[in-house]
Amino acid sequence: MYPAPDMSLWQGRIDSQEGADARRWHQWMRPYADDAEAASVLLGFASDEGVRRNQGRQGARHGPPALRRALANLAWHGEQAIYDAGDIVAGDDLEAAQECYAQRVADLLACGHRVVGLGGGHEIAYASFAGLARHLSRHERLPRIGILNFDAHFDLRHAERASSGTPFRQIAELCQASDWPFAYCCLGISRLSNTAALFDQAQRLGVRYLLDRQLQPWNLERSEAFLDGFLQSVDHLYLTVCLDVLPAAQAPGVSAPSAHGVEMPVVEHLVRRAKASGKLRLADIAELNPQLDSDQRTARIAARLVDSLVN
């Protein structure tokens, strides 16, 4: 049994005098039920154990409810259903929580839903991919899954235990064990936040990436072409946004704020472009730490990105 969602988080303004079209997220959201029609489903991963293991600043376990509160009062422009499936809560047993989240993702995908994960530290990424892989392996022997990560960090660290710095190395190992291709594209990499050893590791694994300084509005056509080339090489897409890809002025509420980063309009544009490919199967937003946020700036940006993925 999974814990029920806390629907009390979905509160906000009601503009009843404006008519039926004056809807907001909190009015449209429904708790997930097993007989729900295929739609977008929000699933939280309340964890920062991976951040702690990675020597980061804790607090991301409070990210999922903060993100729901930021979403609640946004105007709703869709017609499709949307559900809240609650949170998988991780204590200090991160590996067990990742397994539980992966199974929940696989079950939801099997029912025809598109899952949008709410983090939580970026340790959510391994759990998300494992769930997608579990689902696709039931239907395809050699699925071509693309991993699109908006992030200042490669997150390819070697460590004795899983952390927020290891998810894509874990995914690479899972792909190797399954004899699947490891198709990883990372947009927004900071040279100053990744050692030469991590760049070498990325090269060995065939990672495609663009640096934060390359992802500028004046260079958008090249960024689009780079992304399109990656999307054309895969059949299924897992998209994850680590909020530390954004400049610290826009997203202060993360464990490791970026001095440079990639501006929100560029990130949002490329997220929407990836979604428009028709290959998106699963997405998540990671590293929201409301304890470090200022005026809910990071939560509001995260909410806008979730809306871009859903509507």
UniProtKB/Swiss-Prot annotation:
CDD domains: Formimidoylglutamase. It is an enzyme of class 3 (hydrolase). One of its GO terms (molecular function) is formimidoylglutamase activity. Its EC number is 3.5.3.8. Pfam families: Arginase. Mn(2+) 2 binds at residues 151, 153, 242, 244. Its cofactor is Mn(2+). The keyword rRNA processing does not apply. Binds 2 manganese ions per subunit. Can also use Zn(2+). Keywords: Histidine metabolism, Hydrolase, Manganese, Metal-binding. Mn(2+) 1 binds at residues 122, 151, 155, 242. One of its GO terms (biological process) is L-histidine catabolic process to glutamate and formate. It comes from the Bacteria. SUPFAM superfamilies: Arginase/deacetylase. Pathway: Amino-acid degradation; L-histidine degradation into L-glutamate; L-glutamate from N-formimidoyl-L-glutamate (hydrolase route): step 1/1. It catalyses: N-formimidoyl-L-glutamate + H2O = formamide + L-glutamate. InterPro entries: HutG, Ureohydrolase, Ureohydrolase_dom_sf. Homodimer. Catalyzes the conversion of N-formimidoyl-L-glutamate to L-glutamate and formamide. Belongs to the arginase family. There appear to be two competing pathways for the degradation of N-formimino-L-glutamate in P.aeruginosa: the two-step degradation of N-formimino-L-glutamate to ammonia, formate, and L-glutamate (via HutF and HutG), and the direct hydrolysis of the formimino functional group of N-formimino-L-glutamate to produce formamide and L-glutamate (via PA3175). This is Formimidoylglutamase. It comes from Pseudomonas aeruginosa (strain ATCC 15692 / DSM 22644 / CIP 104116 / JCM 14847 / LMG 12228 / 1C / PRS 101 / PAO1). The lineage of its organism: Bacteria, Pseudomonadati, Pseudomonadota, Gammaproteobacteria, Pseudomonadales.
